[in-house]
Amino acid sequence: MFDAYGRNIHYLRLSVTDLCNLRCRYCMPDGVPKLAHEDILTYEEFLRLAALFAQCGIDTVRITGGEPLVRRGVEQLTAGLKAIPGIRRVALTTNGVLLAQKLPALLAAGLDSVNISLDTLHPETFRRITGKDELAAVQNGIRAALASGIPVKLNCVPQPGVNEGELESLAALAQEHPLQMRFIEMMPIGFGAGLPGLSGPELLERFYRRWPRLQPVTGAAFGDGPAVYYSAPGWRGSIGLIAAVHGKFCASCNRVRLTSQGFLRPCLASESGTDLRALLRSGADDAALLQAIQNTILAKPREHHFGQGSMPATRGMYRIGG
């Protein structure tokens, strides 16, 4: 389906929980309130809505959280999504802590690709960022994913004074392994709003100094998301830059987000949207739900306005689904 600005909206990010087993300082630090169990959509509700999204042209679904793997039954949800006519790809974004043990069942369910958060290679820094001592588990998850052959992307948020000294070491993972190592600008959303970041142009300059033969790369393997990818001769993978603040890519945005509470958000940086849970639970039929989805997509804003204030912490990434 095309929105009011001619963008083909075919990608749904599906947040299945607000819970997480880490406490990353820019996303979900200690002390944030949990949602009530009854406020979260059931898998049956997610699948009913996903089938309607498919009728609107959604062909790619990414399962997110919180941390999606802390919710029981994500494998069954994956299989259910894959069975919906029109859904071509189902992907997962995870912190990786539970990935090694969950991956076989996810692959059997038809999972197509996985994105794993990795902000550091050092245990002490990992504890500082996440509040937990789980780096080894994350690394095991990455190794398991690479060994399985499923496409792997790693996501890093550069943070001055925290992990900026090891960004080249993280980038070098793409030199050594067949993966995409992506660097995402800190966004002024929720708890990340008060934290400093490094811009995409700054990062690219650093990486060019280290690897002067880096060249932009494109193609189907790099998807149609916001990242701009680079590689060099002899590399097994690539690095990606997602410059959400300094390289606004709204003109090519192709996605909408459904929160775990059933709120359809057409833009990551906007408070606007539609409460599909209220419609679902008040007895709305499929025609009414489909119309609500279509109206929300048509109302997708032209662009974000990160420079004009931040979203409140109560609307943190862990609630939106990233």
Question: Which residues fall in each region the model found?
Answer:
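Glycine-centered loop/turn positions within well-structured domains
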Residues: L22, P123-E124, K248, T274
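A short acidic, helix-capping loop that chelates divalent metal ions and anchors anionic groups
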Residues: V32-A36, A100, H122-I129, G190-G194, ...
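Residues that scaffold the ATP/ADP-binding catalytic core of kinase and kinase-like folds
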Residues: R23, C27, R71, E124, ...
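Short, small-residue-enriched loops and turns at beta-alpha junctions
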Residues: V16, L35, E67-R71, Q159-V162, ...
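Canonical Radical SAM [4Fe-4S] cluster-binding loop centered on the CxxxCxxC motif
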Residues: A4-E44
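Conserved, mostly hydrophobic/aromatic
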Residues: V16, C20, C24, I63, ...
